[in-house]
Amino acid sequence: MTAAYPPTVARRTRARKGEGAALRAEILAATERLLLETGSAEAVSIRAVAERVGVTPPSIYRHFADKNDLIFEVCAGHFAALDEFLARASEGVEDPVDRLRAMGLAYMRFGLANPEPYRILFMTRADDTPEEYKAVVLRDNAAFDQVRRCAQECIDAGRFRPGFTDAYRLAIGFWARVHGLTSLLVAKPQFPWPDDREAFVDEYASICLAGVVRDE
């Protein structure tokens, strides 16, 4: 017997009162899975999400304005988790340089502990998500802003070498360094990394600030 193509999708009955939140969560979860499978926001469509959940496309629009809004919400939850992770790691660290180093280490640990969310945030094509890399969007990112503010504290405390006076530029450079290693560790787990990976990551957090911090 030949299967019908395209395959039919079992449709849900109309949601009862109180089920809307559960459906919204299912839609977000399906979108996240599609992002991971395709590696591109462009490849994710409202129709594909609807088929994955088992609803009609109009059901998606009752919860999200459009595809961009849907993908934004998927990313927003993970960005909030990253923001909280960095805040906890740097809490109580008085020296601003040590705090910045702690944030870099926390960023890498977050990526290694949560490789799939990390891929969604930083390693998929996401031109229509919060990661458009426009300055106005980037500055609104809470996790990035923590790094920028800490870099400014380092400047104000005279902890950086002369010439390093732009906290925004420094924060981008620091982010680029920690992201570089994190993305490699996530994308290339079979590479012969040092056996003591935790110590290696810890060392790298200090290397990221080499040449910037003033000698004491």
Predicted ranges, named:
Residues E26-R33, R52, D69-E91, A102-R109, ...:
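Alpha-helical structural segments
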Residues M1-A22, R33, A187, E216:
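N-terminal intrinsically disordered/low-complexity leader segments
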Residues C150, I207-D215:
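C-terminal alpha-helix
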Residues T129-V137, I155-Y204, D215-E216:
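Hydrophobic/aromatic-rich alpha-helical bundle segments in the mid-to-C-terminal region
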Residues E26, E37-D69, E73:
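Helix-turn-helix
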Residues R24, I46, N68, F72, ...:
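Short, structured helix-loop boundary elements
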Residues T38, K67, A89-P96, N114, ...:
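Short coil/turn helix-boundary motifs
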Residues A29, V97-E116, Y168, I172, ...:
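Amphipathic alpha-helical segments that line or abut small-molecule/effector binding pockets
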